Structures are given as C-alpha cells and as structure tokens.
Amino acid sequence: MSPSSHKPLILACGLPLSGHIMPVLSLVHGLTDDGYEATVVTGRAFEQKVRDVGADFVPLEGNADFDDHTLDDLVPGRKDMAPSFDRTVQDVEHMMVATLPEQFAAIQRAFKKLSASGRPVVLVSEVLFFGAHPISLGAPGFKPAGWICLGVLPLLIRSDHTLGLDNDRSPEAHAKKLAMNHALEHQIFVKATAKHKEICRELGCTEDPKFIWEHSYIAADKFLQLCPPSLEFSRDHLPSNFKFAGSTPKHRTQFTPPSWWGDVLSAKRVIMVTQGTFAVSYKHLIVPTLEALKDEPDTLTVAILGRRGAKLPDDVVVPENARVIDYFNYDALLPHVDALVYNGGYGGLQHSLSHSVPVVIAGDSEDKPMVASRAEAAGVAIDLKTGLPTVEQIKEAVDSIIGNPKFHEASKKVQMELESHNSLKILEESIEEIASHDFGLLTKSDEETEDIPVKGPALAVSS
C-alpha cells in the first residue's frame, strides 16, 4: 500500500541485537504494508533489514552501535565470562544503561527530521531500549504524540508471587520472592540503577525513572507484550496500559527450496535444530543433536546455522539423515517439522508455536531460562536446563516429545491462542488511539532548537 499522509508517522527503536530489533522490524513491515511511514533507529548492522521493510533508517552512534557479534568488545571481560547472572549485570550496565545518551540523541535526530511534516509521531520501542526513557521524564527535546513499548522478552516487571522463573505461590516462595525483588533493585542492579538515574538527570529529566527493569512497563502509554497469556506466569497486578498482543506477524517471503527439499517433504519425521544468530560454537547444540538423532529411523534432521555463509567446523561429520544449511526461512520449514531443538530465544519459541511445533530447549544465558520455564509450564517444551546438553539428554528429550502426544496437543492450543491475537491490528489500534488523543503531538522545549548533544561521563564504559 502507498504511504498515506493522513496516518501518523512511526518512529521505531530497538537495541541492535537480533532478538530485540527483528520483532520490531516484523511489525514495522506490517505497518508500512498498511500505508504507514516509518523510521527506525537501531545499529548499522541492521540498516539493510530496515530498508527491506520499507522504513527510513537513522543509525545509532558510538558505543550504542554494537551488534550480536561485537558485544564482547563493548563489555569489558565479557568474552572470558561464562553465561551467568554476573554477566547479565555487566550487560545491563554497559549495553543498555551506558549507551542511553547515544540512543536518546539518535531519537532526537529522527524526531527533528520528522517534525517538518507537522503530523503526529508515535514512538514505538522495545522494552530494553532505554533511550526512550528520558522522553517520559521531562527531558528537553522533541516529544512524540505517545509512546508504545513492545515486550520482546518474558515479563520483567516484578510481582509478589513470581520472578519470572516459576508459578509457585506457596508462603515460602512468596517470602523468598519479596526478598529477591528488593535485592534486584537495591543490591544486584544498584549500580546500574544509580547510573540510570544519573544519566537521566544529565539529559535534563525533571523526574527520576522507575527501577530500570520496570520503567518501560509503567511509563509507556501502551505496553504490548508479544506473546499470548498462556506463555506467561499469572500475575496479581499488571499496569492498566498492559495488553497481551500475541506473536509478531508472518510475512510472505520468496522461498527458493534447496536441492534436498524433497527429503523434507518425504520424511516421516523432521527435527529442526538451530542455535539462532548468536551461536558461539555449533558444538554446543547443533553437533550433539546431529549425533543424537543419526540412528533414528525415518527421521530427517535439518540444522540451520543462522548466518549466511556459516559452516560447521571441518572436523564435523554430517550424518546421512541430516541436512545442514547456513540460512533458511523458518516459516517454510516449520510446517513440516515435528520438534524443534534450540537454545531458548523468545522469538524462536513464538515462531515455533505459531506452527504448533513443540520444543526442546537447551539454553542457560540471558533470558533463556525464563523462556524455558514458561514453555515447560505451558506443556509445550522440555527444558534441559543447560546450554551444553549431552547427546543422551537430547535424544531422550526428542524421543519424549515425539512419543507423547500431550506436547503436540498443548502446542496446538497455544497456536490457536496466538491466532486469536493479531499483534499488528492491536498495534495499529494503539497508534490510532494515541494519535487521535493528541498526547502532546510533536513538541519541544522553548530552548531546544538544535540537536541534543551526547554529553557527560555516561559515555565512559567503566570496568
């Protein structure tokens, strides 16, 4: 559809990591198809993908312009750290908080460009793009008509009864979670929280932000969680701006089948394995999965390496019943798949379940344990509770999923639930509601006539 001058403009933002920006781009693709004009702020590694969905591109600068493969350069000592909570704390401080000024400056550059139209601009960001926070806290500069935040991760907002790891509501668990809730803000993330407040003050905010994990949930005009309710633990209280929106929309893409596509179509059973786009070593999951299933009768294993041009190490022998490809359209393969073995990314779970495919999860970093616990509680997954599973663990888990119809039945229920939520429609309704209420439109402070500078010690990456 041609762009419409009657629609509000969209400014979308996301961290330059695949799991964060790709869900945003999926929705932006739908918006541009429906006649919206969109601009996207993210890292240069994703510029072509931004343009491919019909949006204009504004790059992040400086330390904010990282990507999946340069994180170790941004966070001191990261490459030597095993996946752990300590590494997550470091990631938050250096990747999300320290880069906030550069993110905010990029948003302001984009707003300045869009302001000439005189049309309302709606800000759409993902939950960990902290550069949107100062806009809700009185910082000088251009202001959007309103802010919509997208939940591209399991819910991070605290509750008396859940920390995102289980649904235990016993008195003992309740007391433990209350203590952990306090520790998250006042001990574990105390440094990041203090730096977050300091940066916001330096940028001219007239209010202090909420706890770093929760500000986006509370301050956004609309918060759209990109999953169905069954993939979240129950909560006693959620903000009034919160809504479950289902998974991101599917888009038709050109599909050129590989030479072995006939093997997929004729196989009695197909198992897909991938480590996503941020694999450190294919020997962590893909190689042991190929080994685990090499003697399975009537089974074809398809391994997707996640990056164009990627290859398995030279010493890996690919079994006869396996096919390996560098990059592949998931939506083309998943309708033929009986089970997915993967490392627990949030988007991968939604993608798989949108085709009613149950999963085996082997992931222990970032948000992957939270994803796995939700998937297992929903009955659609087996959580191996490790990022380095053995051949025996993988074989047993795949056999269990294939041999027990309850996993496919539960996956089908979630698929139907996903289909009852139209995330693009929900987003467009939210955009139009915000624009029609004219929440400040595109305004700026009296003194703000030039680009917002990136200033202050917040730019320094401390060790």
UniProtKB/Swiss-Prot annotation:
Keyword Glycosyltransferase: yes
Any one GO molecular-function label of the UniProt entry: hexosyltransferase activity
Induction: Induced in early stationary phase (at protein level).
EC number: 2.4.1.-
Keywords: Glycosyltransferase, Transferase
Reactions catalysed according to its record: 18-hydroxy-(9Z)-octadecenoate + UDP-alpha-D-glucose = (9Z)-18-hydroxyoctadec-9-enoate 18-O-beta-D-glucoside + UDP + H(+); 17-hydroxy-(9Z)-octadecenoate + UDP-alpha-D-glucose = (9Z)-17-hydroxyoctadec-9-enoate 17-O-beta-D-glucoside + UDP + H(+)
Principal EC category: transferase
Gene3D superfamilies: Glycogen Phosphorylase B
Top-level taxon of origin: Eukaryota
InterPro entries: EryCIII-like_C (IPR010610), UDP_glucos_trans (IPR002213)
Family of this protein: Belongs to the UDP-glycosyltransferase family.
Functional description taken from the UniProt entry: Catalyzes the first glycosylation step of sophorolipid biosynthesis, the coupling of glucose to a hydroxylated fatty acid to give rise to a glucolipid. Can glycosylate all hydroxyl fatty acids generated by cytochrome P450 monooxygenases CYP52M1, CYP52N1 and CYP52E3 into their corresponding glucolipids. Main products are 17-O- and 18-O-(beta-D-glucopyranosyl)-octadecenoic acids.
Full protein name: UDP-glucosyltransferase A1
Gene name tied to this protein: ugtA1
